[in-house]
Amino acid sequence: MELDSALEAPSQEDSNLSEELSHSAFGQAFSKILHCLARPEARRGNVKDAVLKDLGDLIEATEFDRLFEGTGARLRGMPETLGQVAKALEKYAAPSKEEEGGGDGHSEAAEKAAQVGLLFLKLLGKVETAKNSLVGPAWQTGLHHLAGPVYIFAITHSLEQPWTTPRSREVAREVLTSLLQVTECGSVAGFLHGENEDEKGRLSVILGLLKPDLYKESWKNNPAIKHVFSWTLQQVTRPWLSQHLERVLPASLVISDDYQTENKILGVHCLHHIVLNVPAADLLQYNRAQVLYHAISNHLYTPEHHLIQAVLLCLLDLFPILEKTLHWKGDGARPTTHCDEVLRLILTHMEPEHRLLLRRTYARNLPAFVNRLGILTVRHLKRLERVIIGYLEVYDGPEEEARLKILETLKLLMQHTWPRVSCRLVVLLKALLKLICDVARDPNLTPESVKSALLQEATDCLILLDRCSQGRVKGLLAKIPQSCEDRKVVNYIRKVQQVSEGAPYNGT
């Protein structure tokens, strides 16, 4: 991104500022550098390098007391000018849209970042010296103007991204460390929300600086902005995040509402963080929770397993908030919940799904939905039965994650809906016995530990099924040990029979 584009032509306010600084030779020199950067000739790389070198020399040669001197009641002067310079430098070092995927601009962006990082280190060094030597608000005013742009620069280039190199990341991390040191903050979270109750923190300032780049029309112009916003958001938790909800929620929705899966996932992670760290009352106000639900649940139609995983985890934490508005009087059927809607959609997608990664993702989250609905899972019993039987029949690879999670789901289902299980005894018994036989004779390279886990879970399900059917499983299994030649299968069948007869069993 060109530095001159970050510095607009001097406004009337800038002219007044230059007049205020005219008494200071240092102020005049700084103004000259700013004007040089704003000229069309500054587009040439050698001119920029010369200006950056002049700026570095000027900072080094200037005493700290002159660097932070100001005029007027609000101490406008050099501190404000330094803030303008910091903003311009941050924009100059920011990667352009073309550099998101690396390529020729990759090394150039990293080189610019390293140069700017060294300038920021010099400025922060001056602030540290002034802090240790001056009494009064001068250095604090200067730090106030510097902190936001310096932070954005540091986060942009300290994360491992296509536009960074080990050198640029090292410099950016040094800048962040120096910034935390000079602000006397023990962590980035403390820097953002304040180290104590009396300290305001700097999140409002940083969100204000990021805001122009987070609109729907502009957020893709700088590929780093979404990562800076997301990373910053993740650092702020309860109770500080709620006061910034009006700023962080729209930006998170914008990022999630994109055609690129990577951005969808990033946006959903941001929304999930908001759900976890903002009080339910604030989310229910102005129908925000419903907006979140519709924005997030729409992603369930995108068949991408990483996205589906992020969406389901977020929805499971959002359901308790949404259900606070539901009231059941007890004189009729309970109202259908958002959890019902999502589970119905998941089961619709699960039945015909053949892609293993998606099957595992759905199966991984199914137990949480059954637990969430409890006895109300009976509304979905027929479809759950079809999904469970279908998934138990399909080999899922050496780790067998899908079948293990489906067995866990079946156990929970029988525990929550046991009065409705006995009429499905034969179907479930056949599916479980077939699974035990298939696993016991499995010729694949499935580890023995995984086979044992599958057989153990299937045995637990048979025991639960027997209890739900008042001991009918025991009678149906009575002749199997006599006719089955597979010793491993017979051993697990006998375990079920022994427990049914009252013998202790450590598997349930």
UniProtKB/Swiss-Prot annotation:
Task: Identify the InterPro entries for this entry.
Answer: ARM-type_fold, Tti2
A GO CC annotation recorded here is: nucleus
Q: Does the keyword Transmembrane apply?
A: no
Q: Name one Pfam family in it.
A: Tti2
Q: What is the effect of changing residue 436 to N?
A: In MRT39; impaired TTT complex formation
The Gene Ontology biological process annotation of the record reads: positive regulation of DNA damage checkpoint; protein stabilization
**Bridged cysteine pairs (disulfide):** none
Per UniProt, the keywords (alphabetical) are: Disease variant, Intellectual disability
Spans annotated as Disordered:
1-20
Would I find Repeat among this entry's keywords? no
Quote the disease note of the record: Intellectual developmental disorder, autosomal recessive 39: A disorder characterized by significantly below average general intellectual functioning associated with impairments in adaptive behavior and manifested during the developmental period. MRT39 affected individuals show delayed psychomotor development, severe speech delay, short stature, kyphoscoliosis, and dysmorphic facial features. Behavioral abnormalities include hyperactivity, aggression, and stereotypic movements.
- State the protein's purpose: Regulator of the DNA damage response (DDR). Part of the TTT complex that is required to stabilize protein levels of the phosphatidylinositol 3-kinase-related protein kinase (PIKK) family proteins. The TTT complex is involved in the cellular resistance to DNA damage stresses, like ionizing radiation (IR), ultraviolet (UV) and mitomycin C (MMC). Together with the TTT complex and HSP90 may participate in the proper folding of newly synthesized PIKKs.
Describe the subunit structure: Component of the TTT complex composed of TELO2, TTI1 and TTI2. Interacts with TELO2 and TTI1. Interacts with WAC; WAC positively regulates MTOR activity by promoting the assembly of the TTT complex and the RUVBL complex composed of RUVBL1 and RUVBL2 into the TTT-RUVBL complex which leads to the dimerization of the mTORC1 complex and its subsequent activation.
State the family named in the UniProt similarity comment for this chain: Belongs to the TTI2 family.
Please state what the protein is called.
TELO2-interacting protein 2
Report the gene name. TTI2
